[in-house]
Amino acid sequence: FPADAPKEAIDYIALFKNKEADNVVLLRRGVVNEPKASDHRPVYADVRFATRADKLFCSDPYLQNITSSGVRVMYQTNAVVHTWVEYGTDTVKTKTARTLLAGQEPCFDIENKVRIDSLEPGRKYYYRVCAQEVLLNEAYRKILGGTVKTAWHSFTLPSPDTRNFTAVIYNDLHEQDGVMNSLAQILKNNGIKADLTFFNGDCVPEPRDRAHAIERVNVLMRGANAADVPTFIIRGNHEIRNSYSA
C-alpha cells in the first residue's frame, strides 16, 4: 500500500507445504481491485479441503435390482467422486464396472449406482467399491483425491431352477430402530439367514430432506446387511408425505 503506488504488501495468504497440504486444492485466487474503497488491495484465495478418507462413504454399499445375470450396487458419498466397482468370483482376479452416461462418467452428485451385468446364475461373487474424491473438475484441469476402498462383500445370484429361498419382510418400522434390531436378533438367534430382504412400506417415513432420507435408508441397509443381501424398498403411504417425499 498505498493502492495506487504500492510500496509494501500487508496482505498475504500462505500454506505450509507438508503432507497435509496435499489435502487442499486451490480453486481460484485474485486481488480485490477497489481503489476507492481502500488504500490497499486485499487478496483472496478460494480453497477446498479434501474429505477425510474414513468419511468419504456415507455407509456401506447396498445391493438392489438383482436378477439371474446381474445386480446394482448403490451407495452415497459425502463428496462427488470418480467411482467404480471391482468384482469377481474371488478377490484376486477381478474385473471393473462403472457407470457411463452418454459415454461419460456422471461425476456430479453424491448418489452413486453401478450395474454389474453378464454374470453367471447361481455363482457367488465378491465385490468392493472404490472412489476418488473429485477435488477440482474443470474443462481442462482435473484433480482427484486418493483412492478409498470399502471392505470386500459378496452376493450369490439366483439360478433359474431355484425353488426354495428365504425372504425377510419388514413393514411399518416408522424409524423405530430398536424394533428392527430386535427382529434382526430373533432371526439371528433362530439361524435364519435372508436371501432377500423387503421393506414393505412406511420404513422411510416422512422424509424431511435429502440428508434425512439418506440417513434413514442407510440405517435400514445396515440393519439388513444389504451389502451382502439384496434388498427391495417399497413405497408406502408415509413415504409420500413431507417435503422430500418420493
Model regions and ranges:
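Active-site neighborhood of divalent metal-dependent phosphoester/pyrophosphate hydrolases
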Residues: T162-N181, K188-A246
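Metal-dependent phosphoester-hydrolase catalytic domains
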Residues: F1-K55
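Long, structured stretches of catalytic cores involved in phosphate-ester chemistry, encompassing
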Residues: F1-A9, F16-V24, F57, T99, ...
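Residues at the C-termini of beta-strands that transition into short coil/loop
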Residues: K17-N18, R28, S159, N171, ...
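Acidic, histidine-bearing metal-coordination/catalytic regions of metal-dependent phosphoesterases
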Residues: R41, V47-I169, H174, Q185-A194, ...
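A structural signal for well-ordered alpha-helical scaffolds and beta->alpha junctions
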Residues: A3-I10, S38, S68, N78, ...
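Active-site beta-strand/loop signature of hydrolases that rely on acidic residues for catalysis
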Residues: F1, A14, D39-R48, Y75, ...
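Short secondary-structure boundary/capping segments
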Residues: P2-A5, E34-P35, L63, S159, ...
